[in-house]
From Swiss-Prot:
Skewed-composition ranges (Basic and acidic residues): 313-330
UniProt xrefs under InterPro entries: TAP42/TAP46-like_sf, TAP46-like
Transmembrane segment boundaries: none
Protein name (database record): Immunoglobulin-binding protein 1
Compartments (UniProt record): Cytoplasm
Keyword Cell inner membrane among UniProt keywords: no
Similarity remark: Belongs to the IGBP1/TAP42 family.
Residues modified to N6-acetyllysine: 242
Listed Low complexity bias regions: 292-301
Organism of origin: Mus musculus (Mouse)
Lineage: Eukaryota, Metazoa, Chordata, Craniata, Vertebrata
Residue ranges of the region described as Disordered: 223-242, 291-340
PTM characteristics: Phosphorylated. Monoubiquitination by MID1 triggers calpain-mediated cleavage and switches IGBP1 activity from protective to destructive.
Keywords of this entry: Acetylation, B-cell activation, Chaperone, Cytoplasm, Phosphoprotein, Ubl conjugation
Amino acid sequence: MAASEDELLLPRLPELFETSKKLLEDVEVATEPTGSRTIQDKVSKGLELLEKAAGMLSQLDLFSRNEDLEEIASTDLKYLMVPALQGALTMKQVNPSKRLDHLQRAREHFVHFLTQCHCYHVAEFQLPQTKTNSAENNTASSSMAYPNLVAMASQRQAKIERYKQKKEVEHRLSALKSAVESGQADDERVREYHLLHLRRWIAVSLEELESIDQEIKILKEKDSPREETACHSSLPEKPPMKPFILTRNKAQAKVFGTGYPSLATMTVSDWYEQHQKYGVLPDRGIAKPASADFQRAAQQQEDQEQKDEESEEKALHRMREWDDWKDTHPRGYGNRQNMG
């Protein structure tokens, strides 16, 4: 009875796979926006068919980790791509409120596909890190002061190699496609065709996982500023910092004072040259008598300073008198012309 049920399920599995694969190709080459109703209907239909196909594969138990790649039939190799197709269609879903869920679900599908291919040794590649390992690596990398330039260079080189391999695989696929789809290819060509498809999807899955991890990190950190603001607001306010005075400015204020009159009017060299010019410098402790020119210049300077002081006092006196007059005579005082 179980064998008859399997026979009824087997013919439907290729149909489900090919239909869902065709829907994914239509979505990828469509010119309409991804968020349009037509595209989203195709995405939902493809995911529904792939879910049924995955259930059938689980019931039929086509793949086992105890067997080698050579033990899998050539016609069954393509069903290893079911998780990769699920991940690709999940990435096409458009719903901003559920974007994080879609990314995590797509990541699970891609990791499942890569794990299967790694177990069967379909190609040489490094499995992506799990959530636990990635969390530990993020903690370790955050504690480092500088990024690991060697790791970044190796990642860049790995991307370049994957890109070259992907282009080579696509070129070989285009050469085998017509013969395989028309049924004219032998078993060896069919097997090579499906293996090339698997290797192409391995490269695509690795690229998608990198972009998924980056987008998940951005979405999770989007709400972190709010949490940090809440944490900062709960902390007690610190007292304001005391003003500080530079030692240099403090010492300079002691010498020159804080206002303009305290500043020096001439340097020591200027003073020395001025006194040397008029011959009033001391000679061996005995001061020379001041010359008539120097005495006359000194007297003129004193007279000028006295005149300046007197003029300043007069100007100040006039300003004070004017202020007193304005206090006792309000504006408009004495204007008797416009009285009613």
